[in-house]
């Protein structure tokens, strides 16, 4: 049975112990006191049990991390959120791990997850306070999309400052496609996304994402895309596992307010599915004397 038919039939699973666990976990999340009707979409999805919140899914994240060459590297991660990617980074045995999150609740959560294997600072990605040239890899996922042009450039410029020459900046963001997309349609997608997820999302085309990185002084090494299928049943099975996907469905069905938000987001995602994708880009800071325009 597909998730769509499952939800449309209105099945409700009841398990008081598991529902209590869901409630307790939700209380520990950032913005937990905000009602589901007004909370940012990614934290609404976290409340129902989603752990993989990246537009291109876990597979695209893993491909990006592989190309970023983490083993033995000094890694800084912007906005680690729930710490799902942090766990993958640590599994790659970096020389060091530093998470940077401006939300104190998220920072505390990831700090507990990382433990003695790294550090987490409560700071803004555009002004981390970390030492220049102190990172070999900077990673950021699903965060630049939520920023305006000025903030996008400020965050990327901070990553460039943190990187040693030759260091890699890896991003996983939401993109619109094709690169020649009609501007009116692009604008409508932005507006409808903002209404659905309650965040002023401003996705770019893949070409625009690459251009933005280059304008900030980086050299793009690789670009990969994957379908934007964040709320598709099959994607959730792959990203979350079968049992966790069932828990997510149960949590959605057991809370009317959460259900309305999730179904609203799902409707918007499906409406524009052919024009959206997840994009992962790895770029590097040029070595001294390297021709920035050489591709």
Which residue ranges define each predicted feature?
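Class I SAM-dependent methyltransferase Rossmann-like catalytic core
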Residues: 39-58
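Conserved alpha-helix/loop element of class I SAM-dependent methyltransferases that forms part
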Residues: 54-71
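Conserved class I S-adenosyl-L-methionine
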Residues: 73-81
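Class I SAM-dependent methyltransferase SAM/SAH-binding core
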Residues: 82-127
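A short acidic, Gly/Pro-enriched loop at the edge of an enzyme's catalytic core
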Residues: 126-138
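A short glycine-rich, Lys/Arg-flanked "PGG" loop and its adjoining helix->strand segment in the class I
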Residues: 153-168
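Conserved catalytic/acceptor-binding region of the Class I
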Residues: 168-228
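Conserved Class I S-adenosyl-L-methionine
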Residues: 222-295
């Amino acid at each position: 049975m597909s998730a769509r038919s499952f939800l449309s039939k209105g099945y409700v699973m009841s398990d008081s112990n598991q529902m209590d666990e869901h409630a307790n976990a939700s209380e520990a999340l950032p913005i937990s006191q905000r009602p589901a009707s007004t909370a940012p979409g990614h934290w609404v999805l976290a409340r129902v049990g989603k752990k993989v919140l990246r537009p291109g899914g876990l597979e695209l994240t893993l491909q990006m991390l592989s190309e970023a060459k983490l083993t033995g590297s000094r890694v800084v991660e912007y906005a680690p959120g729930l710490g799902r990617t942090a766990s993958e980074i640590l599994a790659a045995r970096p020389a060091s791990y530093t998470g940077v999150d401006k939300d104190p609740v998220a920072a505390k959560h990831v700090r507990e997850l990382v433990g003695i294997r790294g550090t987490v600072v409560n700071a803004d990605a555009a002004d981390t306070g970390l030492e220049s040239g102190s990172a070999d890899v900077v990673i950021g996922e699903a965060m630049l999309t939520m920023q305006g042009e000025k903030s996008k450039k400020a965050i990327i410029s901070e990553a460039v400052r943190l990187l040693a020459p030759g260091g890699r900046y890896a991003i996983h963001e939401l993109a619109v496609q094709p690169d020649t997309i009609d501007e009116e349609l692009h604008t409508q997608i932005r507006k409808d996304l903002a209404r659905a997820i309650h965040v002023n999302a401003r996705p770019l085309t893949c070409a625009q994402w690459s251009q933005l990185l280059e304008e900030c002084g980086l050299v793009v090494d690789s670009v990969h895309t994957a379908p934007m299928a964040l709320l598709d049943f099959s994607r959730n099975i792959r990203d979350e596992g079968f049992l966790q996907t069932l828990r997510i469905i149960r949590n959605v069905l057991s809370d009317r307010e959460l259900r309305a938000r999730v179904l609203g987001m799902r409707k918007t995602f499906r409406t524009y599915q052919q024009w959206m994708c997840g994009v992962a880009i790895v770029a590097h800071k040029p070595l001294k004397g390297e021709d920035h325009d050489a591709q």
